Amino acid sequence: MIRRRKKVRKLRGSHTHGWGCKKKHRGGGSKGGRGMAGTGKRNKSKWTWTIKYAPDHLGKRGFSRPPEVQREVRVVNLKFIDEHLDELMQMGIAYEEGGKIIVDVTQFADKVLGTGKLTRPLVIKARAFSPKAEEKIKAAGGEAVLV
């Protein structure tokens, strides 16, 4: 059996170590700059790459409102009011007055939305109503009161 030592190719004495000309194995200069250099407005050396792979790299995108200006609108659906009317009565949010049930939504929400349907006439007090919610409240024989 022939035992031959494995030849290890470490390129000793090679001037360029497989990179061709010496200049080709230099830093970012041979690549058009390091990283995203050349993708900007002025030096468009990598412009075709930018357009294909990073089209959103340039330009303005949106605006963030300051947190102190932002206000979360708490919403409630008609479905919730109709299903939980007994609980709202016990909590004192809804009460009966002159044969009508009045629900004061302002204690836990800002706006009433129109998902679901009302099974009985209610007078609902809120800061805002969606058009669909107002329509459904009136169709059930109730009243939408802006506070």
Curated annotation (Swiss-Prot):
InterPro entries: Rbsml_uL15_N, Ribosomal_uL15, Ribosomal_uL15/eL18, Ribosomal_uL15/eL18_sf, Ribosomal_uL15_CS. The keyword Repeat does not apply. Pfam families: Ribosomal_L27A. Residues 1-43 are annotated as: Disordered. Disulfide bonds: none annotated. Residues 29-38 have a biased composition (Gly residues). Coiled coil: none annotated. One of its GO terms (biological process) is translation. GO terms for molecular function: rRNA binding; structural constituent of ribosome. Residues 1-28 have a biased composition (Basic residues). Binds to the 23S rRNA. Part of the 50S ribosomal subunit. Belongs to the universal ribosomal protein uL15 family. This is Large ribosomal subunit protein uL15. It comes from Pyrococcus furiosus (strain ATCC 43587 / DSM 3638 / JCM 8422 / Vc1). The lineage of its organism: Archaea, Methanobacteriati, Methanobacteriota, Thermococci, Thermococcales.
